Amino acid sequence: QHEKLFLAGDAAHIVPPTGAKGMNVAIADVEILAAALERFYASGDESGLKSYSEECLRRVWRVQHFSFFMTSMLHRPANQDPFEAQLQRAQLEYVCSSEAAARSLAENYVGLDRV
């Protein structure tokens, strides 16, 4: 957001999320902005417009973290050393064997409610 200019979706996000999350984030942005605009034009209440960026950024950073997590867990860089490879393998094994980790992965993959 810059003054009265509001960005949403890919226009607002520097790094696109992986794992088919881009459209979900864009829709969430627009949903929040639409509700804020509706309140503003119905009653003059600017609170939703003022909190738009902060509200969206909380979700965006969680999505970016999840994208980073998935990418670093599932893709091997060409210059990966054996220590990093073992850390990556341990993370994948943890996600595959822990109910708590699986639940967290599912929550982040399927979607985040307003954070």
Region spans (language model):
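FAD/FMN-dependent oxidoreductases across multiple families
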Residues: Q1-G22, G44
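C-terminal helical "tail/cap" subdomain of flavin- and related membrane-associated enzymes
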Residues: A20, A35-V115
